[in-house]
């Protein structure tokens, strides 16, 4: 059996036993109970495989579940379940999934619904995850101080010092959650200060979203198209200003102390 044949034979469609996800879906793992829910950015890679194997309806159902969650919570949550948005979001790849489906099987009415959802997601990133320098950062949806302290005390994925103040615990958990939202939990890339960095990849994804919306509305709504085009150009200028080094390499930007990271991450 070839690898391709194995993949084709092992796609498995789930129905959410809790009833939260309204559409059947294909999760990132088959048998691990924790990862049989639909995770946000994992779904992009799953969908590329589904589309390649002609399973367009399964890929569309995955996206429909993400859109459902976005409309319910105001962001695409880390994973699709009733408490999925309490933690954070994940890298904004929904527009790439929509683009892939538009190419694989155009559906003008569905595309209108999907693009309306993308505009809503864009508002989330531009209001809840904007930094003072004008670029975007990762963050957390957890606002309750007691919850952050409790989560610090119970954290097991990496070793954390216990004899620290509650303020340190709160700031550490904010950054660890932001790191999780980046999809790279955990990484030395952000020096345990992920919420203080405007990431190259995050801002590149948002540039891609702005470019997609500019193009989509090009022959439908000139005003919207111009708005997203101007936002795209502004982002490109800010990324060049804050992220580009003398050799033309882009680095994550720590806006809290006006420093480019010394880590080559993108």
Located regions from the model:
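Acidic, mature catalytic/reactive cores of soluble proteins
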Residues: 1-266
